Amino acid sequence: MPHLERDGEVYVLQLGDGENRFNQDFVDAVTSLVQEVAAAPAPRALVTAASGKIWSNGLDLEWMSEHVEAIEPLLDSVHALYAELLGLGVPTVAAIQGHAFAGGAMLALAHDIRVMRADRGWFCLPEVDINIPFTHGMSALITSRLPVPTAHEAMTTGRRYGGAEAVQAGIAVEAVAEEQVLPRAVAVAAALAGKDPQTLQAIKQRMYASTLAALADSAANSISLPT
Protein backbone atom coordinates (compact mmCIF):
# COMPACT_ATOMS: atom_id res chain seq x y z
CA MET A 1 0.00 0.00 0.00
CA PRO A 2 1.10 3.61 -0.44
CA HIS A 3 3.17 5.07 2.38
CA LEU A 4 5.17 8.16 3.29
CA GLU A 5 8.92 8.49 3.71
CA ARG A 6 10.85 11.64 4.52
CA ASP A 7 14.04 13.17 3.15
CA GLY A 8 14.72 16.39 5.04
CA GLU A 9 11.95 18.84 4.20
CA VAL A 10 10.63 16.60 1.43
CA TYR A 11 7.93 14.01 2.00
CA VAL A 12 8.13 11.11 -0.45
CA LEU A 13 4.82 9.40 -1.14
CA GLN A 14 5.65 5.91 -2.37
CA LEU A 15 2.78 4.54 -4.47
CA GLY A 16 4.10 0.97 -4.52
CA ASP A 17 5.85 -1.50 -6.78
CA GLY A 18 2.88 -2.88 -8.73
CA GLU A 19 0.57 -1.29 -11.28
CA ASN A 20 -0.69 1.21 -8.69
CA ARG A 21 -4.18 1.17 -10.14
CA PHE A 22 -6.98 3.24 -8.67
CA ASN A 23 -9.47 1.26 -6.63
CA GLN A 24 -11.22 2.78 -3.63
CA ASP A 25 -8.73 1.60 -1.02
CA PHE A 26 -5.76 2.83 -3.05
CA VAL A 27 -7.25 6.27 -3.74
CA ASP A 28 -8.32 6.69 -0.12
CA ALA A 29 -4.81 5.81 1.05
CA VAL A 30 -3.10 8.24 -1.32
CA THR A 31 -5.55 11.02 -0.50
CA SER A 32 -4.99 10.53 3.23
CA LEU A 33 -1.22 10.73 2.78
CA VAL A 34 -1.46 13.89 0.66
CA GLN A 35 -3.62 15.47 3.35
CA GLU A 36 -1.10 14.43 6.00
CA VAL A 37 1.62 16.30 4.12
CA ALA A 38 -0.67 19.31 3.66
CA ALA A 39 -1.19 19.45 7.43
CA ALA A 40 2.51 19.12 8.28
CA PRO A 41 4.44 22.19 9.44
CA ALA A 42 6.23 24.22 6.78
CA PRO A 43 8.71 24.15 5.16
CA ARG A 44 7.77 21.02 3.26
CA ALA A 45 7.33 19.65 -0.25
CA LEU A 46 5.90 16.46 -1.73
CA VAL A 47 7.41 14.00 -4.18
CA THR A 48 5.24 11.15 -5.45
CA ALA A 49 7.29 8.14 -6.50
CA ALA A 50 6.98 4.43 -7.22
CA SER A 51 9.24 1.46 -7.87
CA GLY A 52 9.28 -1.17 -10.57
CA LYS A 53 8.43 -0.63 -14.21
CA ILE A 54 5.13 1.23 -13.61
CA TRP A 55 4.45 4.56 -11.88
CA SER A 56 0.68 4.19 -12.21
CA ASN A 57 -1.67 2.61 -14.74
CA GLY A 58 -4.69 4.60 -13.58
CA LEU A 59 -8.19 3.28 -12.99
CA ASP A 60 -8.52 -0.33 -11.90
CA LEU A 61 -10.95 -1.34 -14.65
CA GLU A 62 -11.14 -4.94 -13.46
CA TRP A 63 -12.08 -3.82 -9.96
CA MET A 64 -14.65 -1.42 -11.40
CA SER A 65 -16.25 -4.14 -13.54
CA GLU A 66 -16.63 -6.26 -10.40
CA HIS A 67 -17.96 -3.37 -8.27
CA VAL A 68 -20.28 -1.54 -10.65
CA GLU A 69 -22.18 0.04 -7.78
CA ALA A 70 -18.92 1.58 -6.53
CA ILE A 71 -17.85 3.22 -9.80
CA GLU A 72 -19.46 6.58 -9.11
CA PRO A 73 -17.98 6.96 -5.60
CA LEU A 74 -14.58 5.89 -6.93
CA LEU A 75 -14.67 8.46 -9.73
CA ASP A 76 -15.66 11.15 -7.24
CA SER A 77 -12.67 10.17 -5.10
CA VAL A 78 -10.28 10.17 -8.06
CA HIS A 79 -11.40 13.61 -9.21
CA ALA A 80 -11.14 14.87 -5.62
CA LEU A 81 -7.57 13.55 -5.39
CA TYR A 82 -6.63 15.35 -8.60
CA ALA A 83 -8.16 18.54 -7.20
CA GLU A 84 -6.42 18.09 -3.84
CA LEU A 85 -3.03 17.92 -5.54
CA LEU A 86 -3.71 20.63 -8.10
CA GLY A 87 -4.68 23.22 -5.50
CA LEU A 88 -2.30 22.11 -2.75
CA GLY A 89 -0.35 24.75 -0.84
CA VAL A 90 2.71 22.49 -1.06
CA PRO A 91 5.18 22.19 -3.96
CA THR A 92 4.63 18.83 -5.65
CA VAL A 93 6.88 16.80 -7.96
CA ALA A 94 6.06 13.51 -9.68
CA ALA A 95 9.12 11.25 -9.89
CA ILE A 96 8.11 9.04 -12.81
CA GLN A 97 10.47 6.07 -12.98
CA GLY A 98 8.22 3.97 -15.23
CA HIS A 99 4.98 3.99 -17.17
CA ALA A 100 2.31 6.60 -16.38
CA PHE A 101 -0.86 5.69 -18.26
CA ALA A 102 -4.41 7.05 -18.36
CA GLY A 103 -5.53 8.09 -14.88
CA GLY A 104 -1.94 7.62 -13.71
CA ALA A 105 -0.74 10.13 -16.30
CA MET A 106 -3.43 12.52 -15.07
CA LEU A 107 -2.25 12.02 -11.48
CA ALA A 108 1.19 13.09 -12.67
CA LEU A 109 -0.30 16.16 -14.36
CA ALA A 110 -1.94 17.20 -11.09
CA HIS A 111 1.59 17.70 -9.70
CA ASP A 112 3.43 20.97 -10.23
CA ILE A 113 6.46 19.36 -11.87
CA ARG A 114 7.31 16.04 -13.49
CA VAL A 115 10.71 14.33 -13.72
CA MET A 116 10.83 11.25 -15.95
CA ARG A 117 13.21 8.41 -16.65
CA ALA A 118 15.12 8.96 -19.88
CA ASP A 119 15.59 5.47 -21.26
CA ARG A 120 12.34 3.65 -20.43
CA GLY A 121 8.76 4.40 -19.44
CA TRP A 122 5.89 5.99 -21.34
CA PHE A 123 3.57 8.87 -20.54
CA CYS A 124 0.32 8.02 -22.32
CA LEU A 125 -3.36 8.95 -22.37
CA PRO A 126 -4.80 5.89 -24.19
CA GLU A 127 -8.49 6.62 -23.63
CA VAL A 128 -9.13 7.13 -27.35
CA ASP A 129 -7.91 3.57 -28.00
CA ILE A 130 -9.81 1.89 -25.17
CA ASN A 131 -13.09 3.69 -25.91
CA ILE A 132 -13.38 5.57 -22.63
CA PRO A 133 -13.94 9.31 -23.26
CA PHE A 134 -12.36 11.69 -20.77
CA THR A 135 -14.68 13.12 -18.17
CA HIS A 136 -15.28 16.86 -18.11
CA GLY A 137 -12.98 17.19 -15.11
CA MET A 138 -10.24 15.07 -16.65
CA SER A 139 -10.37 17.10 -19.87
CA ALA A 140 -10.10 20.31 -17.88
CA LEU A 141 -7.13 18.97 -15.92
CA ILE A 142 -5.22 17.84 -19.00
CA THR A 143 -5.84 20.98 -21.03
CA SER A 144 -4.93 23.26 -18.12
CA ARG A 145 -1.62 21.49 -17.49
CA LEU A 146 -0.29 20.84 -21.00
CA PRO A 147 0.48 23.06 -23.99
CA VAL A 148 -2.52 23.08 -26.34
CA PRO A 149 -0.86 21.13 -29.21
CA THR A 150 0.45 18.51 -26.77
CA ALA A 151 -2.92 18.12 -25.05
CA HIS A 152 -4.66 17.72 -28.41
CA GLU A 153 -2.16 15.14 -29.66
CA ALA A 154 -2.04 13.19 -26.40
CA MET A 155 -5.82 13.06 -26.00
CA THR A 156 -6.84 12.36 -29.59
CA THR A 157 -4.06 10.01 -30.73
CA GLY A 158 -3.03 8.13 -27.59
CA ARG A 159 0.62 8.83 -28.38
CA ARG A 160 3.19 7.33 -26.03
CA TYR A 161 5.85 9.82 -24.99
CA GLY A 162 9.25 8.66 -23.81
CA GLY A 163 11.20 10.81 -21.39
CA ALA A 164 13.03 13.00 -23.93
CA GLU A 165 9.87 13.39 -26.02
CA ALA A 166 7.91 14.34 -22.91
CA VAL A 167 10.40 17.10 -22.14
CA GLN A 168 10.15 18.42 -25.71
CA ALA A 169 6.35 18.33 -25.52
CA GLY A 170 6.19 20.23 -22.24
CA ILE A 171 4.98 17.25 -20.21
CA ALA A 172 8.10 16.85 -18.06
CA VAL A 173 10.84 19.27 -17.09
CA GLU A 174 13.66 16.72 -17.12
CA ALA A 175 14.43 13.17 -18.22
CA VAL A 176 17.26 11.53 -16.31
CA ALA A 177 18.81 8.11 -15.72
CA GLU A 178 16.70 5.65 -13.74
CA GLU A 179 18.77 5.94 -10.58
CA GLN A 180 18.56 9.73 -10.71
CA VAL A 181 14.78 10.11 -11.05
CA LEU A 182 13.97 10.16 -7.35
CA PRO A 183 17.07 12.08 -6.17
CA ARG A 184 16.52 14.71 -8.84
CA ALA A 185 12.82 15.04 -7.98
CA VAL A 186 13.69 15.40 -4.29
CA ALA A 187 16.27 18.08 -5.11
CA VAL A 188 13.76 20.03 -7.21
CA ALA A 189 11.15 19.75 -4.46
CA ALA A 190 13.60 20.73 -1.71
CA ALA A 191 14.47 23.94 -3.55
CA LEU A 192 10.79 24.92 -3.43
CA ALA A 193 9.93 23.73 0.09
CA GLY A 194 10.23 27.20 1.62
CA LYS A 195 7.36 28.72 -0.36
CA ASP A 196 4.65 30.18 1.88
CA PRO A 197 1.80 27.63 1.94
CA GLN A 198 -1.05 30.13 2.05
CA THR A 199 0.36 32.20 -0.79
CA LEU A 200 1.11 29.16 -2.94
CA GLN A 201 -2.33 27.68 -2.34
CA ALA A 202 -4.07 30.96 -3.20
CA ILE A 203 -2.08 31.27 -6.42
CA LYS A 204 -2.80 27.70 -7.52
CA GLN A 205 -6.47 27.73 -6.59
CA ARG A 206 -7.05 31.00 -8.45
CA MET A 207 -4.96 29.91 -11.43
CA TYR A 208 -6.89 26.64 -11.74
CA ALA A 209 -10.29 27.81 -10.48
CA SER A 210 -12.20 26.58 -13.54
CA THR A 211 -10.37 23.23 -13.52
CA LEU A 212 -11.06 22.73 -9.82
CA ALA A 213 -14.74 23.50 -10.43
CA ALA A 214 -14.86 20.97 -13.27
CA LEU A 215 -13.22 18.31 -11.11
CA ALA A 216 -15.86 18.92 -8.41
CA ASP A 217 -18.78 18.56 -10.85
CA SER A 218 -19.82 14.96 -10.17
CA ALA A 219 -22.67 15.05 -12.68
CA ALA A 220 -20.22 15.72 -15.53
CA ASN A 221 -17.61 13.23 -14.41
CA SER A 222 -19.14 9.82 -15.05
CA ILE A 223 -17.76 7.24 -17.48
CA SER A 224 -19.02 4.13 -19.18
CA LEU A 225 -16.81 1.08 -19.23
CA PRO A 226 -16.24 -0.52 -22.65
CA THR A 227 -18.26 -3.69 -23.23
PLM region spans:
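Conserved CoA-thioester-binding segment of acyl-CoA-metabolizing enzymes
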Residues: 1-49
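Terminal peptide-recognition signature
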Residues: 13, 29-30, 48, 60, ...
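A general structural signal for well-ordered alpha-helical segments in protein cores
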Residues: 27, 61, 78, 139, ...
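Short, active-site-adjacent cap segments at secondary-structure transitions
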Residues: 52-56, 101-102, 207-210
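Crotonase-fold acyl-CoA enzyme core
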Residues: 84-196
